[in-house]
């Protein structure tokens, strides 16, 4: 830390506090903070290791994540919230293989509903849909492109942070997890890999 200027220390403090409150730092939203964190990744990593946290810099996808040792900071989700995130992650995985790394996958509400139908899961109420979209926005997982989120044509941009929310990247694992809910799996919260703050 001796070679770091006072100004950079202050800026790194802002970055670390941002990560503690948001869990993700996306280049898409916070370009300046992102570049500062990448430039000083070794120092930030050492600092966070002292308190047992992992500092993951995913430059390929423009995403930085912090993870506590036992995932204590995760948000405990209800079953319908878990299903929603699993479906988004599944769509993300299916679409991203056809895109370049710098591009974000898009989906529509109709496509999301279609996944629910595929797994014979009832879709959520309009009120719950608004809550789920808000959770996605707050946690930098998605962004609605259109104003009417209840319209089947409403488009959503899915961010690369989806990779780090649910660690099961394998499509078969995602299918099986969603299928377990359609068969009456009674999980009240997400698995230990979940790192939504």
UniProtKB/Swiss-Prot annotation:
Q: What happens when the gene is disrupted?
A: When this gene is missing the Wadjet system does not confer plasmid-transformation resistance in B.subtilis.
Its signal peptide is none
- The species this protein was found in: Bacillus cereus (strain Q1)
State the source organism's domain of life: Bacteria
Pfam families attached to this UniProt entry:
DUF4194 (PF13835)
Gene assigned in the entry: jetB
Q: What is the lineage of its organism?
A: Bacteria, Bacillati, Bacillota, Bacilli, Bacillales
State what this protein does: Component of antiplasmid transformation system Wadjet type I, composed of JetA, JetB, JetC and JetD. Expression of Wadjet type I in B.subtilis (strain BEST7003) reduces the transformation efficiency of plasmid pHCMC05.
Provide the protein name. Answer: Wadjet protein JetB
Q: Which cysteines are cross-linked by disulfides?
A: none
User: Cross-referenced InterPro entries, in alphabetical order?
Assistant: JetB
